[in-house]
Every structure is written in structure tokens, then in C-alpha cells.
């Protein structure tokens, strides 16, 4: 299968004043596991606007803005937000994404079925702007 270059720019912008320099580490391990279903339910208010994905969690007023070059990988972006919501809830277990579950939109299924991303980690620093760029070929 042709390799796809994926570029994800992740911005984390906490809205709660006073919570600065609080480190939060999110480990995203993407495997074929149905655990992703329950975790994704923690993500609310998924809004697509101008090619960007806005996700708000119930854990606090933090929202995650993800700019995606290829809109067909929106499901992967929502998985990042789900992992972040899981971290905010106090659970530090690895996040598993079921590649056969439609997390966000139907047109993302072809990418999810074709790609298995294992062991990808993102580090989030709450209270500060973080720009994380990922260039990763996926077969």
C-alpha cells in the first residue's frame, strides 16, 4: 500500500487561569483494541471549523485544537484528545484505539483500517502552548 505522510500540529490551550506549569504526559498506543470505544466517549463537543478540529472534554474547561493537513485522519486526532481526557480523569493507563471503530467521521474509516500506529507518544504541558509536529509514514 502506498505510504502516506501525516502531519499533525497539536496545540493545547488551557482556559483555566492559574494552572500553569502543570505537566501532563499522555501516552498514545494505537492498537486493535475495543478499549477505545469507552475512552472516546469522554470527548465532547467535536467541531470541525476551517479544517481544524476542536475538542472539549468534560474533565475541565481545557480544549484541544488540532490542525490537520489531511482531513481524512480526523479520527486519529480525536484519539489524541480522548487520551488527553483520560489523563485528566486520573487514569494513567495506555490508550488503545480500535482501528475498526468510527471515532469521528465515516470518511476516516479508510485511513483507520489501513493504518496501525503503535507506540506513538505525545507529551502535553498544561498551561503553556505546545507545538508538536509529527512526520510519520504509514503503510
Name the predicted role of every residue range.
Residues 3-14:
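Sec-dependent N-terminal signal peptides
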Residues 7, 17-50, 127, 131-139:
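A structural "domain/chain start" motif
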Residues 91-139:
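C-terminal/domain-edge helix-coil "capping" segments
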